[in-house]
Amino acid sequence: MSSLREIILDTETTGLDPRQGHRIVEIGAIEMVNKVLTGRNFHFYINPERDMPFDAYRIHGISGEFLKDKPLFHTIADDFLEFISDSKLIIHNAPFDIKFLNHELSLLKRAEIKLLELSNAIDTLVMARSMFPGSKYNLDALCKRFKVDNSGRQLHGALKDAALLAEVYVELTGGRQSAFKMVDKSVETNNLATNQVNNKTEQATIVIKPTKEELQKHKEFLSSILKTA
């Protein structure tokens, strides 16, 4: 059986529109194979080379001072593109993240880099609107609907929000009964994660009915991200 690799992705930014000079300050992406989290992820804070507006700071709590010594986007771009490769992207409100990522990629002025296609993204916001018309569709509301524990989400954060979205996405596409066998390895959330984790996707297999131990491993995976991201 061929493997289905999907990347659950989120970003944090300095504002709402890259055309007004706003930039990405955090990228969080989590690998899922056959609807199973592998424990492999990509996470960076990024120096936006500009100030942090207070309105944005109130949302994610990332200060300009904190970002001063963080890498510039161009230094992590190749690793990011390698991590997502040709996989389907799972994003909540995909047009927002795609436009910011493409803006950052366009600033590199490298002819060999192709911009991301919105058609290659699955938008969980669109899915939720279709499935639950008239309801609230933000991540907190969906976590509440599906009883996903988001108690550690006082502020937005790209990696922790991607972890929550992974749970929501599985619920939107069939529920926990069809997924979430966790790979038995520690979660790597540092900047070397893409090189340190074994990428043998055959380790991930679909589980029709997860055991208590498997569900506990998933909870521990999510908790570790909420505590450290």
UniProtKB/Swiss-Prot annotation:
Alphabetical list of InterPro entries matching this protein: DnaQ, DnaQ_proteo, Exonuclease_RNaseT/DNA_pol3, RNaseH-like_sf, RNaseH_sf
Residues that bind a divalent metal cation 1: D10, E12, D161
Catalytic activity: DNA(n) + a 2'-deoxyribonucleoside 5'-triphosphate = DNA(n+1) + diphosphate
EC number: 2.7.7.7
Pfam families: RNase_T
Coiled coil is among the record's keywords: no
GO molecular function, one term: 3'-5' exonuclease activity
Enzyme active site: H156 (proton acceptor)
A Gene Ontology cellular-component term: cytosol
Keyword field contains Hydrolase: yes
Residues at which substrate binds: D10, E12, D55, H60, D161
Name this polypeptide is given: DNA polymerase III subunit epsilon
Native source organism of the sequence: Rickettsia felis (strain ATCC VR-1525 / URRWXCal2) (Rickettsia azadi)
